[in-house]
Amino acid sequence: MFGSNISVGNFPTFISAPDDYIQITSWDTGDWNGKVDIGNYVLISPGVRIMAADSVSIGDSCMFGHGASITDADWHGIYDRTKVVGDPRPVVLEENVWIGEDAMICKGVKIGANSIIGARSVVTKDIPKNTIYAGNPAVFIRDLDENEFITREDFFQDPAKLAKDFDLLDRYTLGQNSFLGWIKSMIFRDKSH
């Protein structure tokens, strides 16, 4: 995280890795007072990049796939390449938005509640609520029934079930690990990293 105007709500889930970190930047120097507001129950996967020279607002229960990117600026002028930031415009994601893997959300965009942006899509215009958009540029795919959603907030409402689900996930993820495997990994280190 870089910048002082970054706020994160309750119960966030940030998943990162040494070679695929999350980057959240509020450009709040000089003429710019960028801010990033992240709501409650938000899921941010490895490689996600959120950059604000003006404002990026992320509603409750939003999810970001691996490598998704949001920016509210061009970061340089079109003709004057020495001009930092360019012409920033706020980005707003309403509640329960799902941004697919490697999708890019550009400046000035508002994405309505419950909408889904497909993997590797490029969004340059507002997206209505309860819809799926995908492609480059992103185009309408279909409507969604607003009464069918179970959100990340719902997921966190039963702590006992949540603990059990995470325990099952850990067991599945780590199921092939063993003490002998760990010893081998310490002796015969993988030199490709």
Q: Where do the protein language model's features map onto the residues?
A:
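Short glycine/proline- and charge-enriched loop/turn segments
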Residues: 77-84, 149-154
